[in-house]
Design a protein with these regions (language model features):
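Active-site-proximal helix/loop segments of hydrolytic enzymes
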Residues: 3-205
Length: 205
């Protein structure tokens, strides 16, 4: 995925856009980025400090079972205009000769998904434990939630010491965030297409 991100950065810069990668491959192999994303040089902090308008997070999806066909999934913020997310999904499907994901859970449109935190009463999940004031309709995915400030319900204030502090959680200047699942690594069809047609995927985005 890092190669994809570098390719996308180059394409966007060729269009005159300014792009910052929050991960460039220089990170230590044994570095657990889950627990340092809010550090001074962490991914969330870098994104928030960049002054960017938008954050795109590229991912390869997976599940427990090998599947024949996976497909593209674009995750967006709840209560937002999904026009851009729909455009991303359509472009990738058409230009990269892939398909929309068949997953129905969290689906808002073909290839477009909105997942929110479903907070249990006992706060047993690790990333909500000991926090108060978290409501169900905020984004589940941290890269969307924690880069959007007040607008997306960013809440990581150090209550759970394992995850640090998001110094931008109360910012009224947030980034518009999307997580792009290019396909499923446990689908041979998806994986081969991504490896063979990486340029088409990035051109679509």
């Amino acid at each position: 995925v890092l190669d994809c991100a570098k390719d996308l950065k180059s394409k966007l810069e060729d269009m005159g856009l300014k792009v910052l990668l929050t991960r460039d491959g220089s990170e230590s192999d044994d570095e657990d980025t889950v627990y340092n994303i809010y550090d001074e040089d962490g991914r969330v902090t870098m994104a928030n400090e960049s002054g960017a308008k938008m954050v795109l997070s590229l991912h390869l999806n997976s599940n427990e079972n090998e599947i024949t066909e996976g497909g593209v999934e674009i995750y967006a913020c709840p209560n937002s205009d999904l026009t851009f997310a729909k455009l991303l999904a359509t472009n990738i499907v058409n230009l990269a000769d892939t398909s929309y994901s068949k997953m129905e859970t969290y689906k808002e449109a073909e290839g477009v998904y909105v997942r929110t935190i479903e907070v249990d009463r006992n706060r047993t999940s690790s990333f909500t434990r000991n926090y108060t004031g978290i409501f169900d309709s905020i984004p589940y995915l941290f890269i969307i939630r924690e880069t959007g400030g007040i607008a997306t319900g960013a809440y990581v204030d150090g209550t759970n010491e394992s995850y640090g502090v998001n110094e931008y959680r109360n910012s009224n200047v947030g980034l518009e965030g999307y997580l792009i699942e290019l396909g499923y690594i446990n689908s041979n069809k998806d994986l081969e297409n991504i490896l063979d047609n990486q340029d088409s995927y990035m051109e679509a985005i």
